[in-house]
Amino acid sequence: DQKLLDTASEVIKRNFDNPDFDMNMLASELNMGRSKMFLRLKEVMGLTPNEFTMKLKLEEALRLLQEEPQYNISEISYRLGFTSPRYFSRCFKSFYGVAPLSYRKDSPREDSQAEEDIQE
């Protein structure tokens, strides 16, 4: 079960920036039929493969918003394979309850970035 999760996570993360990545590709990478993959992942994780993919993308978005201030919302959305920044923002807000830009403004920033802001 852990090997399945690890492999699925690795495949999904490797394809973050691929807007054409879909569940058929994931099933192929996992050497499973699509139906079996859906059943196994739902059984192991309690999430559908689509939900798991979205969860991983949004967790990475959270990290990028916190740790990579050089990327704007559009860049983050495209890096993670979203078809538009608007769709990314809607998904992020639905998952975390706050828009990505608001999250970035309200999240604690690293000391070095805060010091740079003070010096400007």
Model region roles, listed by residue range:
Residues A8-S9, A27, A61, A99, ...:
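A sequence-composition feature that detects small, non-aromatic residues
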Residues E43-T83, K105-E120:
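Terminal helix-turn-helix DNA-binding modules in bacterial transcription factors
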Residues M23-F52, L56, S77-A99:
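Basic/polar phosphate-binding segments, predominantly the helix-turn-helix DNA-binding elements
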Residues D1-N31, K36, R40-E43, I118-Q119:
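Membrane-proximal linker segments that couple transmembrane helices to downstream signaling/catalytic modules
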Residues S9-F21, L41, M45, L62-N72, ...:
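Basic, amphipathic alpha-helical hairpins
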